[in-house]
Amino acid sequence: MGQSPRKYQAEALSVIWWALKNDDFDNIVVQAPTGIGKSAIAMTVQDRFRNAYLLTPTLGLTDQYRRDYGSKMKEVQGRRNFACWARSGTADGAPCYKKKKKCRHAEEDDPCPYYEQKFAAEKARLTLSNPSYMFRVTQSQAAGFEQRDLAVIDEAHNLESFFLDLL
């Protein structure tokens, strides 16, 4: 946390540490009001794991994590956020994606901006992304993003509507 946790953060962390030591818990949900410091709690918890994903569904939260903890993580964004070096337009229309053609910029020795951030995020101890991107990557069984020891999903109460929107 960088500084001593506030009372409610310390209480939440105490319960989380207890639950993590107890093998009966696969999922832990922290529900607390805005401003309590859930992001700081999440960052403290992930520090105890070898590697983790941090998923947040909103740009506001992504910006907050990037601003407050950017040096501790690598962010990965979807292709539409990057220009394609093989043709005009964004990388979501790239031949290597749309037509599954081989592209020299999809290799680690000369990556385009999309692949550069993707390769860095794959190797990072902590990767920041959004549920939509990670769901699509894992569903497509794309190489690179392997299972991690921990997944922190900020705003997890919105996951049901997120998955319903995919149908």
Please provide the spans of the model-predicted regions.
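Alpha-helical elements of the RecA-like P-loop NTPase motor core of helicases
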Residues: A40-M43, D63, R136, S161
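Short basic/glycine-enriched coil/helix segment immediately N-terminal to the Walker B
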Residues: N22, Y114-R125, T138-L150
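Hydrophobic residues on the short alpha-helix immediately C-terminal to a glycine-rich phosphate/catalytic loop
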Residues: I16, V45-R48, Y65
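SF2 helicase catalytic motif II
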Residues: S132-Y133, F145-L167
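Conserved pre-motif I regulatory segment
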Residues: M1-Q31
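Short amphipathic alpha-helical segments
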Residues: R66-D68, Q139-A142, L164-D165
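Motif I (Walker A/P-loop) of helicase-class P-loop NTPases
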Residues: I36-R48
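A substrate-engagement module of RecA-like helicase motors
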Residues: Q3, I28, R50-T127, S132-F135
